[in-house]
């Protein structure tokens, strides 16, 4: 049986840990609110951009001069998966679930005979994927050095993807990230980024124009060539913002659970401490009484 001193030290240690997890929970809650606000602020722009792209892509998808970013290369032999996770842990199964989705997608594509390359955005995803798929990882990016996720962040990732596409390194690009459903629910998903026509069909309901005819100036092709990179960057930014919100939600839930578990452990240790102390006092009293009777 542990001594009273050992029990007291352990209770103090658990209380210190509880204070840390409670503080981390409060920090995650504050960051979650900011992340949700950022994601909600970006949503109207992304939706309107998708609607515009849907209209333009309808006019251009069947024309010979359509951009490969829009219609693809005509093949689907090589895939690029952009796996987005967090740089830090202590957020429950958030990172593990995204990596699990990425593994499933990689294995499914390889089973079909596809060539697969991976870009890891986030340290935790890279650390886990390199155990089994180190040869597939072509680039790793960490975001911990950036205080907030901005358009510049998505442009940096988008430029890398477009450079690889222009060099013929892949035919289809998918983003593997977390869809923020609620504080306690983050759903891993794989979303097509290139060809953009597939991403648009998947991500937006084509609006009913009511018979209206739209003129594009100077022309649809020129506008699409300008908007396609921006649209891709918008999709990437939206995924990054949802990922941050999901990470903070998972971290807040994990730290809340840890804080409650610490409280339960403290109660149990206090009970053991009191019983041990009571047993020790009883033993001492018994020894005193026995000694008195011997006299």
Swiss-Prot record:
Pfam families in the cross-refs: ATP-synt
Assigned keywords, A-Z: ATP synthesis, Cell inner membrane, Cell membrane, CF(1), Hydrogen ion transport, Ion transport, Membrane, Transport
Subcellular location: Cell inner membrane
Highest taxon, organism lineage: Bacteria
Keyword Cell inner membrane applies: yes
Main subcellular localisation: membrane
Membership in a protein family: Belongs to the ATPase gamma chain family.
Described function: Produces ATP from ADP in the presence of a proton gradient across the membrane. The gamma chain is believed to be important in regulating ATPase activity and the flow of protons through the CF(0) complex.
Record text on subunit structure and interactions: F-type ATPases have 2 components, CF(1) - the catalytic core - and CF(0) - the membrane proton channel. CF(1) has five subunits: alpha(3), beta(3), gamma(1), delta(1), epsilon(1). CF(0) has three main subunits: a, b and c.
Name of the protein described by the UniProt record: ATP synthase gamma chain
Originating species: Maricaulis maris (strain MCS10) (Caulobacter maris)
